[in-house]
């Protein structure tokens, strides 16, 4: 019989200045690459997507994006990162819909095929 692994969650908040976010051969990248095989989930909270190493970004299961103050970060970071899923224009419209209310955010479920977009966790955004 298959034995279930114990589950563990690691939450890292705003570690961009530590240097650990920028290296492919660090414990944080290992958490993303091998963690799921060990029953480990890793959540990152960052102000800039570009501070996360591409190896970690390639293993994201979801993205939560609140309203950003900087359009460059929005377009060069979030929207460009997701541009293989939909056009940047479409992604920008989804972002605007999801973040128009105070404290609201765009939830992108990258585990679903096709990828799903939500306003918070409440309202699914349907793309025609």
At which residue positions do the language-model features occur?
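Conserved P-loop NTPase motor cores
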Residues: 1-89
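P-loop NTPase motor core of the ASCE superfamily
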Residues: 6, 23-24, 30-32, 74-128
């Amino acid at each position: 019989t298959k034995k279930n692994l114990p589950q563990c969650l690691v939450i890292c908040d705003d570690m961009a200045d530590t240097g650990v976010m920028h290296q492919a051969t660090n414990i944080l990248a290992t958490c993303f690459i091998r963690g799921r095989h060990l029953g480990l989930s890793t959540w990152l909270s960052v102000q800039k997507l570009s501070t996360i190493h591409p190896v970690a970004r390639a293993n994201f299961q979801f993205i939560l994006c609140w309203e950003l103050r900087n359009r460059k970060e929005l377009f060069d970071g979030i929207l460009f990162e997701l541009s293989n899923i939909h056009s940047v224009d479409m992604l920008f419209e989804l972002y605007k819909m999801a973040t128009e209310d105070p404290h609201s955010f765009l939830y992108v479920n990258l585990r679903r095929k096709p990828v799903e977009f939500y306003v918070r966790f409440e309202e699914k955004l349907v793309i025609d």
